[in-house]
């Protein structure tokens, strides 16, 4: 406990966010059932709710069903960010994506490029582009484009966001602010000051997303420019990397105890994936199955210090039960 408390008192650092599954305008589960669903029987919402407070006792023939019930019931009521807040937060924490432009060389065909980016204060992606790059020439001829971001590129069930918009050159009066925003995410990008480089802003038209592909909780939706820009970036998500790294390295058993106490699911392992002001997400395992669980905080976290306080409180509650 002492080392856990001491860690959270260290200086803060800003880190890249590690994204989560969401459903448009609803609080639906982020559980990954890529393997679990094949074993667990489909259940009604009513039967799931009846077992939300039950603990699983293994050795019985219906243990798989009990686990599915507990996961489903827990995930449906777990506190989480609204979908548009989640998307705004994930985009703000991301640093690279797939840019799609209209090819000038191969007319009528799309052209894809991996690009680094940073979001400005309004959530618009900023690109540092070279006049020599093919995608720059494409954008100058036709500004319509899209930017695809994966919260975790290695998780095919995870959140995918596509921002459609028009790429425009940043005006002279905005150069300093945009340069600062870009270098804050890419501090080693010294080439942005080269003569052939300039900044372009993708002005959003619509933001689409899909999550939970190949799981029991497939979801998709879209938000207008106004909805997207009105959403706020979660202030706690920036601390995800230092907190999760420390917890996974030094306190995995503590995380597992918290998950078991909150969900009643006797997970065999639990790795913290990310966090926000309302809670954190874990990748858990149980009897050969791997799935995601949402672990809500008892209340909204106010700052980095409060995250420490909440996790310690949750651990103390788990150890007292």
UniProtKB/Swiss-Prot annotation:
<feature type="region of interest" description="Dimerization">
    <location>
        <begin position="144"/>
        <end position="166"/>
    </location>
</feature>
<feature type="binding site">
    <location>
        <position position="134"/>
    </location>
    <ligand>
        <name>heme b</name>
    </ligand>
</feature>
<feature type="binding site">
    <location>
        <position position="130"/>
    </location>
    <ligand>
        <name>heme b</name>
    </ligand>
</feature>
<feature type="binding site">
    <location>
        <position position="135"/>
    </location>
    <ligand>
        <name>heme b</name>
    </ligand>
</feature>
<keyword id="KW-0408">Iron</keyword>
<dbReference type="GO" id="GO:0033014">
    <property type="term" value="P:tetrapyrrole biosynthetic process"/>
</dbReference>
<keyword id="KW-0150">Chloroplast</keyword>
<dbReference type="Pfam" id="PF01243">
    <property type="entry name" value="PNPOx_N"/>
</dbReference>
<dbReference type="InterPro" id="IPR011576">
    <property type="entry name" value="Pyridox_Oxase_N"/>
</dbReference>
<feature type="region of interest" description="Dimerization">
    <location>
        <begin position="96"/>
        <end position="116"/>
    </location>
</feature>
<dbReference type="InterPro" id="IPR019595">
    <property type="entry name" value="DUF2470"/>
</dbReference>
<dbReference type="GO" id="GO:0042803">
    <property type="term" value="F:protein homodimerization activity"/>
</dbReference>
<comment type="subunit">
    <text>Homodimer. Binds to heme in the interdimer interface; the heme iron is coordinated by a fixed water molecule.</text>
</comment>
<dbReference type="GO" id="GO:0009507">
    <property type="term" value="C:chloroplast"/>
</dbReference>
<feature type="site" description="Dimerization">
    <location>
        <position position="222"/>
    </location>
</feature>
<comment type="function">
    <text>Dimeric beta-barrel protein binding to heme and catalyzing its degradation to produce biliverdin. May function in the tetrapyrrole biosynthetic pathway.</text>
</comment>
<dbReference type="InterPro" id="IPR012349">
    <property type="entry name" value="Split_barrel_FMN-bd"/>
</dbReference>
<keyword id="KW-0934">Plastid</keyword>
<keyword id="KW-0560">Oxidoreductase</keyword>
<keyword id="KW-0479">Metal-binding</keyword>
<feature type="region of interest" description="Dimerization">
    <location>
        <begin position="205"/>
        <end position="208"/>
    </location>
</feature>
<dbReference type="GO" id="GO:0042167">
    <property type="term" value="P:heme catabolic process"/>
</dbReference>
<feature type="transit peptide" description="Chloroplast">
    <location>
        <begin position="1"/>
        <end position="45"/>
    </location>
</feature>
<dbReference type="InterPro" id="IPR037119">
    <property type="entry name" value="Haem_oxidase_HugZ-like_sf"/>
</dbReference>
<keyword id="KW-0809">Transit peptide</keyword>
<protein>
    <recommendedName>
        <fullName>Non-canonical heme oxygenase HOZ, chloroplastic</fullName>
        <ecNumber>1.14.-.-</ecNumber>
    </recommendedName>
</protein>
<dbReference type="GO" id="GO:0016491">
    <property type="term" value="F:oxidoreductase activity"/>
</dbReference>
<dbReference type="GO" id="GO:0046872">
    <property type="term" value="F:metal ion binding"/>
</dbReference>
<keyword id="KW-0349">Heme</keyword>
<dbReference type="GO" id="GO:0020037">
    <property type="term" value="F:heme binding"/>
</dbReference>
<dbReference type="Pfam" id="PF10615">
    <property type="entry name" value="DUF2470"/>
</dbReference>
């Amino acid at each position: 406990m002492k080392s856990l408390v001491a860690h959270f008192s260290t200086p803060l650092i800003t880190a890249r966010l590690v994204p989560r599954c969401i459903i448009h305008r609803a609080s639906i589960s982020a559980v990954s059932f890529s393997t679990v669903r094949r074993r667990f029987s489909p259940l009604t919402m009513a039967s799931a709710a009846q077992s939300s407070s039950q603990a699983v006792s293994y050795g019985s023939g219906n243990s798989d069903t009990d686990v599915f019930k507990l996961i489903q019931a827990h995930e449906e009521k777990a506190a989480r960010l609204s979908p548009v807040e989640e998307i705004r937060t994930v985009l703000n924490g991301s640093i690279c994506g797939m840019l799609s432009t209209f090819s000038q060389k191969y007319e009528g065909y799309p052209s894809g490029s991996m690009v680094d980016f940073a979001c400005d204060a309004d959530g618009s992606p900023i690109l540092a582009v070279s006049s020599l790059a093919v995608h720059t020439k494409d954008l100058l001829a036709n500004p319509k484009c899209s930017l695809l971001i994966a919260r975790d590129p290695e998780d095919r069930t995870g959140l995918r966001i596509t921002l459609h918009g028009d790429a425009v050159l940043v005006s002279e009066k905005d150069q300093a602010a945009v340069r600062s925003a870009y270098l804050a995410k890419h501090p080693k990008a010294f080439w942005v000051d080269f003569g052939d480089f300039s900044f372009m802003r993708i002005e959003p038209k619509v933001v689409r997303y899909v999550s939970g592909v190949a799981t029991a909780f497939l979801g998709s939706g879209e938000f207008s420019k106004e909805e997207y820009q009105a959403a706020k970036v979660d202030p706690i998500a920036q601390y995800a990397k230092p907190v999760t790294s420390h917890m996974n390295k030094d306190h995995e058993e503590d995380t597992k105890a918290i998950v078991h106490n909150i969900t009643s699911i006797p997970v065999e392992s639990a790795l913290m994936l990310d966090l926000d002001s309302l809670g954190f997400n874990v990748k858990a395992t149980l009897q050969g199955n791997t799935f995601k669980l949402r672990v809500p905080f008892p209340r909204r976290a106010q700052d980095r210090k409060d995250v420490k306080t909440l996790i310690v409180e949750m651990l103390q509650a788990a150890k007292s039960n």
